[in-house]
Amino acid sequence: MNIEEFIPIKKEESEINQMSPLVWAYVGDCVYELYIRTYLVDNTSLKPHKLHIESIKYVLRLFHCCQRNHLQAKFLENFYEDLTDDEKDIVRRGRNANNHHLPKNSNVQEYMYSTAFEGLIGYLYLCKKYDRVKEIIEKYIL
């Protein structure tokens, strides 16, 4: 059984494109976390508590890139170079999404860029572009 049989996605790309970028980010957050957790289980022999600690480090790696202006600029510059025009549009829509809820340990700019990244991952996943999801996570996070 492949992923499309395990978790079928029935919506067409045109329908997915009409979704709120916050929906993409909601899915992207989950896909990103599952990818990191699976990677750690497959590549380490850590016990559950240590797995949790390590997975948090990968999430923080993304957030730290988004927190510090110089790191953020470098991350986005490198990240943007590899995106297609359509992907850049998805990132822009995710970054500009109007969310009225801000996590207490986050600032607005940090949250915007994290939402943009998660939005792209979610969008690509929903559009069944699994190879691209893997490529982005492996290149920029692992």
Summary of predicted features, one role per range:
Residues 1-142:
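Double-stranded RNA-binding/processing signature
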